[in-house]
Each structure stands twice: as structure tokens, then as C-alpha cells.
Amino acid sequence: MARPTGKKFDKRRQQQNPLFKRKKFCRFTAAGVEQIDYKDTETLKDFIGENGKITPARLTGTKAHYQRQLDTAIKRARFLALLPYTDQHKA
């Protein structure tokens, strides 16, 4: 049997799924940021997972241009001990 498709089915599925998340957007584009600063640790912490890994752009909605800057900024902050490498280190 064929699966139902179309807008009507999509709306019904979204209403039934309690885990449906709103559309992702790039926070840096919305804020008009040109460069991501490695010294802004509060912003960088939002993009680091619970175990210390950098969260991928497909989960955060960050554009590729800013994701590259974000990766570099997090790595610089880690090197300078502004951010921990893993969850076992205290920040």
C-alpha cells in the first residue's frame, strides 16, 4: 500500500509528533555577525555538546561559512584553556 503524501499528511504528522522542532536558522546570520570571536566563550559553549564535542551544523542550523569560523574559534579557545577539551575537565 502506498504511503500518503502531500501537505495535508505533513501537517497531520507534525501535529501528532510532540518532538517536532521548529525550523532551524543561523544565529550568526540573524545577528549580523561578521567574525566569531574565540574569546566569547558563552556563545561558543552553546555549540559544544555535553561530552565536549563540537555540535554539527545539521543540528544547529549554522551556515557553512560560520560553522568553519566556529570550529576554528572553539579550537583556539580550547588551546588557550578558555574552554575544556572534554566533559571531564572543569571550565
From Swiss-Prot:
Keywords: Ribonucleoprotein, Ribosomal protein, RNA-binding, rRNA-binding
Record bears the keyword Plastid: no
One GO process term, biological-process aspect: translation
Protein origin, superkingdom: Bacteria
Gene Ontology cellular component list: cytosolic small ribosomal subunit
Signal peptide annotation: none
Matching Pfam families: Ribosomal_S18
Classification via Gene3D superfamilies: Ribosomal protein S18
UniProt GO MF annotations: small ribosomal subunit rRNA binding; structural constituent of ribosome
Quaternary context: Part of the 30S ribosomal subunit. Forms a tight heterodimer with protein bS6.
Assigned protein family: Belongs to the bacterial ribosomal protein bS18 family.
Protein purpose: Binds as a heterodimer with protein bS6 to the central domain of the 16S rRNA, where it helps stabilize the platform of the 30S subunit.
PANTHER family named among the record's database cross-references: 30S RIBOSOMAL PROTEIN S18, SMALL RIBOSOMAL SUBUNIT PROTEIN BS18M
Record protein name field: Small ribosomal subunit protein bS18
Naturally occurring in which organism (per UniProt): Burkholderia multivorans (strain ATCC 17616 / 249)
